[in-house]
């Protein structure tokens, strides 16, 4: 199976090919999909829909912390580059109360500075992370176990 299929099977979004995935009762999972088709909202609207209690200042600060400028923040998500769209999705994820993150290629489309900021944020994360990534230089020093799904091996 593919990596995205594996993650979606774990989450129960699609049925497992065999066996079953059973999640614990106290999991609060945040999921970062590799590709998502953006809607018509601006970045501000995207975050406000997710966090309606935030003030405009808090929404703008959260988006800025993810590397988006005022120009980006006021633009529709669909006109942004792939990296900028990913930053909006990451903004939602890091501001959600979770104890498990499932990340499907979160570094795709990100520039070096954004990758560094993401790695810093993930290193401070207190929960568990299941990360699909093809960039050893990104996950090196961040992860405790590496699973090679193509060879079905666990690397230490």
Language model segments and positions:
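ABC ATP-binding cassette signature C-motif
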Residues: 1-156
């Amino acid at each position: 199976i593919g990596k995205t299929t594996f993650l979606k099977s774990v989450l129960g979004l699609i049925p497992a090919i065999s066996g079953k995935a059973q999640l614990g009762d106290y999991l609060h999972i945040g999921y970062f999909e590799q590709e998502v088709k953006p809607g018509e909202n601006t970045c501000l609207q995207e975050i406000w829909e997710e966090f309606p209690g935030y003030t405009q200042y808090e929404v703008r600060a959260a988006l800025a912390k993810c590397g988006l400028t005022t120009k980006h923040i006021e633009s529709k998500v669909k006109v942004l580059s792939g990296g900028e769209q990913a930053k909006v999705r990451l903004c939602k994820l890091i501001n959600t109360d979770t104890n498990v993150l499932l990340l499907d290629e979160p570094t795709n489309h990100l520039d070096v500075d954004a990758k560094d900021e993401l790695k810093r944020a993930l290193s401070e994360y207190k929960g568990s992370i299941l990360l699909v990534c093809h960039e050893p230089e990104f996950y090196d020093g961040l992860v405790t176990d590496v699973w090679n799904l193509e060879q079905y091996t666990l690397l230490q």
